[in-house]
């Protein structure tokens, strides 16, 4: 069972391109639906399958449960964002950016969007990054706002196919082989005793920081200082957790593959997914809790109560998966580590400096840029 129930959107152009490149058909592996932020009571937004940005305008105009004043406040504020080309003071939080929006708009649109895109609550999430995500989703490619929900697990969505693609072309994949250090040898690098032209660090932030801290003493003075500073910047990142509570109920089925939930301190899940509509067994639901530091037992009990209160379902807990360092905290003015460390040494990952938060698309674009950087 995956953790986090990954959501892709149509604006993930590089992810979709790379999937096709390695032989994965997005039409078969992803369920495509219009942008939907509907609650169990039927209120919320649902974009029609219209051209960009008419889909967003229509979704706002027809939002269920919203007063005319709610819709008007969002249109006024969003027009201002567009007028300013979706740019703002980098020190602003999403909550500060949206302070003129009405409470319902914040609760039923901004907060769910923010926590799903940045995995950071609006009170401490970067407004600048949030606006970049909105710009690409709502005003980028046609269909950029459409939800793409995986029908297969994450390994089959890309990594397994990518490994097969590489092997078919003569690439070597060495599993279970931990790298202790990366040694500089003039214009080359040594990894596990093997001399190579270049190294791309495609690891977690903590592992990359450890590796470069151990490698710095053997590098040339200028490179050593860069590696130490990079490791320091990376180790200073803070992280947010993601938890997924899997629960089952006989005959349990949602009106849509994904529903938004009203979240608070005692009802922590922000989204629920109907796994039966995404290739899973009947009756299995997945509740996703982003940016929470509660223990698994507490989360599980709270989510089961939330299911009774908001969905009217009495469910049996199957498994609770918690990843404490799932994504970096995407806060205002955050300093992220650079991609280029030294000639022939490049880092990539969703945490590396870039315009996006910790998303699949951010990671894929970072990897693509790293490969392109080797040829510069």
Where are the model-predicted features located?
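Conserved N-terminal glycine-rich FAD pyrophosphate-binding loop of Rossmann-like flavoproteins
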Residues: 1-9
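Local beta-strand N-terminus motif with an aromatic residue
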Residues: 5, 27, 196-197, 315
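Helical element adjacent to the flavin cofactor pocket in flavoenzyme catalytic cores
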Residues: 133-189, 197-198
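Mobile amphipathic helical/loop "lid" adjacent to a hydrophobic cofactor/ligand pocket
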Residues: 12-131
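Mid-domain catalytic core of redox enzymes
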Residues: 177-299, 305-310, 337-338
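A short coil-to-beta-strand element that immediately follows conserved catalytic motifs
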Residues: 29-31, 174-175, 242, 311-323
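Short glycine-/acidic-enriched loop or helix-start segments at secondary-structure transitions
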Residues: 18, 210-212, 217, 330, ...
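Conserved flavin/dinucleotide-binding core of flavoenzymes
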Residues: 270-376
């Amino acid at each position: 069972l995956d953790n986090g129930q990954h959501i892709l959107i149509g604006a993930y152009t590089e992810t979709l391109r790379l999937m096709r490149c390695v032989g994965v058909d997005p039409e078969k592996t992803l369920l495509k639906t219009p942008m939907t932020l509907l609650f169990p009571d039927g209120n919320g937004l649902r974009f029609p399958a219209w051209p960009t940005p008419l889909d967003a305008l229509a979704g706002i105009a027809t939002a269920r449960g919203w007063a005319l004043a709610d819709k008007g406040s969002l249109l006024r504020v969003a027009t201002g964002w567009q007028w300013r080309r979706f740019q703002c003071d980098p020190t602003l939080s999403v909550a500060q950016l949206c302070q003129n929006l009405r409470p319902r708009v914040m609760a039923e649109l901004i907060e769910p969007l923010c926590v799903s895109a940045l995995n950071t609550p609006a009170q401490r999430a970067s407004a600048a990054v949030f606006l970049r995500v909105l710009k690409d989703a709502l005003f980028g490619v046609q269909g950029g706002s459409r939800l793409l929900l995986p029908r297969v697990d994450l390994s089959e969505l890309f990594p397994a196919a990518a490994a097969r693609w590489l092997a078919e072309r003569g690439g070597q994949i060495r599993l279970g082989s931990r790298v202790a250090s990366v040694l500089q040898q003039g214009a080359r690098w040594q990894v596990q005793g093997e001399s190579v032209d270049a190294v791309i660090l495609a690891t977690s932030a903590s592992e990359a920081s450890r590796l470069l801290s151990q490698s710095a003493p053997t590098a040339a003075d200028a490179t050593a200082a860069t590696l130490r500073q990079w490791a320091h910047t990376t180790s200073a990142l803070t992280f947010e957790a993601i938890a997924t509570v899997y629960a089952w109920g006989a005959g349990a089925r949602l009106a849509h593959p994904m529903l938004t939930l009203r979240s608070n301190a005692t009802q922590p899940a922000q989204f629920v997914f109907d796994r039966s509509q995404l290739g899973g067994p009947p009756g299995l639901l997945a509740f996703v809790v982003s940016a929470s530091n509660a223990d698994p037992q507490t989360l599980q009990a709270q989510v089961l109560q939330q299911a009774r209160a908001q969905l009217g379902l009495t469910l049996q807990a199957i498994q609770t998966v918690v990843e404490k360092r799932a994504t970096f905290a995407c806060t205002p003015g955050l300093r992220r580590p650079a991609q280029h460390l030294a000639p022939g040494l490049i880092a990539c990952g969703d945490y590396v400096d870039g315009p996006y938060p910790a998303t699949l698309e951010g990671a894929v674009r970072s990897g693509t840029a790293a490969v392109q950087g080797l040829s510069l």
